[in-house]
Amino acid sequence: STDRKSYDMPWPWGGNCGVVDFTLPAVADWWGAYQQKPIDDGISGFWTDMGEPAWSNEEQTERLVMKHHLGMHDEIHNVYGLTWDKVVKEQFEKRNPDRRVFQMTRAAYAGLQRYTFGWTGDCGNGDDVSQGWGQLANQIPVILSAGLGLIPFTTCDITGYCGDIEDYPAMAELYTRWIQFGAFNPLSRIH
């Protein structure tokens, strides 16, 4: 918030986390210093996951009173991930002018392509190979739509997000088809 108060929100996997107001100009340099430590340790990219930000359930009302520099969270939540990705890229380039950053995010908004690679998010197969085929089929229109929506660099989790699948021959076939599809993605990566 503008009074530098942190809004805590329940983390989907337990506990709380803070929501950084990337719309506040002073936050950029603070975040740049924060992210520089892992860069100095050798990383060259960031996966800005859950930039919506994700809520563990929609019944939680904390977001209704969360005020950012540009307005109430429910009014600007679609641009939240974009502002995060913008700060990450600009701060990386400012502090590391001779290096190139890699970023990947699932929180898409107009202009995303200027800062980061798009990612379709976790596509879960659960514990069932038949669900995996459905998830693979879903990725094709999602990635094509992203490209038509001017986010040409979009990828998915090759093999989905599997649980404990014990039907190994069926999983091997699905895995092969995921890899074949992934070979035609702008970024091919196995999850």
Where are these regions (language model features)?
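Catalytic-domain carbohydrate-binding cleft regions of carbohydrate-active enzymes
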Residues: 1-191
